[in-house]
């Protein structure tokens, strides 16, 4: 949407002020963590995706890593499963882990990829589970399938970036402990 109160001179000034940052971050990789609470507002989600596409179009290599806490909680509530938290972390048994994967992969990741593409970008959804990209160990037995990251293989992300796409990474990881 174009703000009609902004003149062409204003736009030129904005671009002039942005130029040093465009030059500094051109061809650099930045990781944007897009938390579930920031996804609650549809208007904010639209603006964030527009900003990500803009960064991509000016040559910044954006990696979008998303969560989905509120959406996961809503889905668990719909199936009658109450969320439990220990020290701010969701207790995740097998059933909860399945819901988390369904929400992150089947709903949020696909939605963000689609929105980026509607805004004019090219995106591919990937998971920390893909190719054991993100490995973890159990953080605390009381938390179930909640882990601490022990290794990240960035090769899949770099491959996606090299092909000119924005990787949209859902925050799931692999552990051999459970």
Q: What is each residue range found by the language model?
A:
Residues 1-176:
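Nucleotide/pyrophosphate-binding catalytic subdomain
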């Amino acid at each position: 949407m174009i703000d009609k109160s902004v003149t062409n001179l204003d736009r030129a000034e904005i671009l002039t002020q942005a130029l040093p940052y465009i030059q500094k971050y051109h061809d650099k990789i930045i990781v944007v963590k897009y938390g579930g609470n920031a996804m609650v507002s549809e208007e904010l989600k639209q603006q964030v995706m527009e900003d990500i596409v803009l960064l991509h179009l000016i040559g910044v290599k954006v990696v979008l890593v998303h969560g989905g806490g509120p959406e996961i909680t809503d889905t668990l509530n719909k199936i009658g499963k109450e969320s439990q938290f220990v020290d701010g972390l969701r207790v995740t048994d097998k059933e909860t882990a399945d819901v988390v994967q369904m929400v992150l992969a089947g709903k949020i990741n696909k939605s963000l990829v689609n929105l980026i593409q509607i805004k004019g970008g090219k995106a591919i959804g990937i998971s920390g589970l893909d190719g054991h990209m993100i490995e973890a160990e159990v953080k605390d037995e009381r938390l179930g399938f909640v882990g601490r990251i022990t290794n990240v293989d960035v090769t899949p992300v770099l491959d996606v970036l090299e092909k000119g796409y924005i990787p949209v990474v859902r925050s799931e990881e692999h552990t051999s402990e459970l």
